[in-house]
């Protein structure tokens, strides 16, 4: 399944998105914004910092993590890096005062995930709610970087627990150092599927 996922994500990156961008302005901006970001020369911007990386799909999901971010910021040596996948979230970055650096999340190919993690050099990583990106999580696990999923919500009908995705998804979920879920029902679903690195955070 991991091999199949990588084939699909490469096809999306190299073929499907470029074709669709001809007809869809939003997809065209998606490609252009990430290309511009990748071409900038940031040098060793993040090499010496104690970087904590948060990833959210949108501004709404980011707001779920503000309490954790404010706690982390008590350590003045840390730098908070925030990534968005959506254009709408990124456009509102100037409203977010707690963040030191904001980027678009590159697509989850093996090379792009590896290069981006190398670039931002995180010491800890927090994915918010339902943001599960296999190659990013696999690379973070390989580099032994503590990675957390916060404010997660799981139901027994979720794709994670369906054949043929089950083993693939379980391996990803078990890579997290800790999964913080919204309610006991979510915890019970994970425990039932032998995913024990879970705590109810409310």
Question: What does each model-identified segment do?
Answer:
Residues 1, 5-12, 16-23:
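Membrane-interacting alpha-helical segments
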Residues 17, 21-202:
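Active-site and donor-binding regions of nucleotide-sugar-utilizing enzymes
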